[in-house]
Amino acid sequence: MTELQMFLMENPVDNITVKVRLGGRLKDFEFELKPMNNNDMSKYQKLCVKNPGSAKKKEFDVQKFNELVVINNVITPNFKDPEWMKSAGVLTPEALLNKVLLAGEIAELSEKVSEISGFGDNSEDLEDEVKN
């Protein structure tokens, strides 16, 4: 086995988590995130295409994509928690997300998930975060 193969076997991507902080009103709190794998990303993208049957006019729903990324890749807090949804008076994770976070906070969390999923320039910083 090559050194790269050994590294990849010893460092599977299914157990990576990273704690991050956002700015503004949430600067004192940590969110725990997990990266997206290729299958998840493909599924989210397919769910976010508007007019999928129309060959001429297809649109991508960025807001829905960000919501799916955050709901499914933020470990803490858990936006799928039924007790939290009930206490917030909502029925879905999407409704909870939009009740407790601002649009920019949702976008920022989605961006952070994308970064730890291998998209972005700061791979050295992410490697340090993963080690901690």
What are these regions, as identified by a protein language model?
Residues N15, L33-P35:
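Long, low-complexity, highly charged intrinsically disordered regions that are enriched for acidic
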Residues V13-N15, K57-K58:
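A general, composition-driven signal for non-globular sequence regions
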Residues M1-V13, S123-N132:
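Low-complexity intrinsically disordered segments
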Residues D14-K27:
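Short acidic-hydrophobic surface loop/beta-edge motif
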Residues F29, M36-N132:
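Short, surface-exposed, charged amphipathic helix/loop patches that serve as local interaction elements
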